[in-house]
Amino acid sequence: MTSPPGTRGRPPASPPDLFTFPGRRHARWHAGVLLAVLLGGLYLARRHWPALESGAGRLAGADPGWLLVGATAALGTWAASALAQQGAVLRRLPGSRLVAAQFAASAANHLLPAGLGAGAVNLRFLMRCGLPAGRSAGALAVKATAGAMVRLALIALLAPACPGLLRPPHPTPTTLAVALGALVLLAALPATPRWARCRRALTAVLADIRALHTCPARAVALWGGCLAFAALHSLVVIAVAQAVELPLPPLQVALLYLAASSAAALLPTPGGLGSLDAALALALTVSGAPGAAAASTVLGYRLLTVWLPLLPGLLVLGVLVRRKAL
């Protein structure tokens, strides 16, 4: 068979890239949200600059032993994430590249909002390991669902040990209106044309979860990795709090972190930057911690989990891309 005129010698057309942006409008919306969050963060930083400056000074004189504990726990979070990702797929993944991909994904997660960076890196890695696109996306959904369930279970487990610490907010008319609108949207979802696609995706995720639980080793890896990931992040906050002598018990600090991080996950900011910082600092302050100690705790947590590993993580990301592991 001869080639059509004008196409002889040309390479075959490549499929569209999976990681192209959904559209200029969505990109502008994400950029607008990110700009608003950054401006809000700058405003809060300027308004509370004395507390931030005092917190940074207090962090400089913190106990180095506790900071070392926090740094060790931060290193363990990438291994825990790799364990959970392995538990979300039946196929055996290359261990060293899996850990490196989680390290790179954590760095990419701080550049794009709502987990898009980490999701793109992990999706690409799983596809490079031979999983189809649908199965790769399903594995990410399984891991995210298990992580959310583990986080909620830890909150429910720690809340009785810290009575009165988590107080439900008083509902305002605006909150009630937003909740009512969300319920109306959920009720109208089955009538939309996209419902069939959503139902097929949900059915596929549930099928993947059932298949994983037929293999006990994968189920233990999934739930154990998610539990270790949440516990190690809590340990980082506890260690920094102990290093700066935050006057709150460790269980309360862990519960406040889990609640603040769960709330911050609803806001589309890169890696929770800004949203988690504000939520955690507010939770610690409302619970009785001094503003300077709360600020230094948040700064120390961010230093160990974001700023110190950010550049090495981006370098690892570049190496993985160069070696076609992503």
Predicted regions and their residues:
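Hydrophobic alpha-helical membrane segments of integral membrane proteins
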Residues: 124-125, 140, 152-153
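Transmembrane alpha-helix interface/packing and boundary motifs in multi-pass membrane proteins
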Residues: 105-113, 258-277
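Transmembrane helix-loop junction
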Residues: 90, 110, 128, 242-243, ...
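Mid-bilayer segments of alpha-helical transmembrane spans in multi-pass integral membrane proteins
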Residues: 106, 110-116, 144-156
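Predominantly cytoplasmic-facing regulatory/coupling regions of multi-pass membrane proteins
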Residues: 1-103, 161-265, 291-296, 304-326
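Membrane-interface alpha-helices at helix entry/exit sites of multi-pass transporters
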Residues: 97-100, 114, 118-119, 128-145, ...
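C-terminal halves and exits of single transmembrane alpha-helices
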Residues: 103-119, 232, 304
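Re-entrant/interfacial helical elements at transmembrane boundaries that shape
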Residues: 87, 117-129, 157, 270-286
